[in-house]
Amino acid sequence: MTTEKIYPIFTVRWLAVHGLAVPTVFFLGSISAMQFIQR
């Protein structure tokens, strides 16, 4: 029972972290690339 109760929470947390981290890294990367190209 404990594994079934912890598994969904861990999955949701994993998806939330990656869902927020991936766009943030892409956004910062694109901004740094724009500034690097402008210079």
Swiss-Prot record:
UniProt key word Cell membrane: no
InterPro entries xref list: PSII_cyt_b559_bsu (IPR006241), PSII_cyt_b559_CS (IPR006216), PSII_cyt_b559_N (IPR013081)
Keywords, alphabetical: Chloroplast, Electron transport, Heme, Iron, Membrane, Metal-binding, Photosynthesis, Photosystem II, Plastid, Thylakoid, Transmembrane, Transmembrane helix, Transport
Residue ranges of the TM segments: 14-30
GO function terms (MF aspect): electron transfer activity; heme binding; iron ion binding
Membrane topology note: Single-pass membrane protein
Coiled coil: none
Superkingdom, natural source: Eukaryota
GO terms classed as biological process: photosynthetic electron transport chain
Keyword Thylakoid: yes
Cofactor binding note: With its partner (PsbE) binds heme. PSII binds additional chlorophylls, carotenoids and specific lipids.
Localization: Plastid, Chloroplast thylakoid membrane
Main location: plastid
One Pfam entry name: Cytochrom_B559
Binding site for heme: 18
GO cellular component: chloroplast thylakoid membrane; photosystem II reaction center
Obligatory cofactor(s): heme b
Similarity section: Belongs to the PsbE/PsbF family.
Stored HAMAP family: PSII_PsbF
NCBIfam families the record matches: cyt_b559_beta
Complexes and interactors: Heterodimer of an alpha subunit and a beta subunit. PSII is composed of 1 copy each of membrane proteins PsbA, PsbB, PsbC, PsbD, PsbE, PsbF, PsbH, PsbI, PsbJ, PsbK, PsbL, PsbM, PsbT, PsbX, PsbY, PsbZ, Psb30/Ycf12, at least 3 peripheral proteins of the oxygen-evolving complex and a large number of cofactors. It forms dimeric complexes.
Role description: This b-type cytochrome is tightly associated with the reaction center of photosystem II (PSII). PSII is a light-driven water:plastoquinone oxidoreductase that uses light energy to abstract electrons from H(2)O, generating O(2) and a proton gradient subsequently used for ATP formation. It consists of a core antenna complex that captures photons, and an electron transfer chain that converts photonic excitation into a charge separation.
Entry protein name: Cytochrome b559 subunit beta
Organism: Gnetum gnemon (Spanish joint-fir)
Lineage, top ranks: Eukaryota, Viridiplantae, Streptophyta, Embryophyta, Tracheophyta
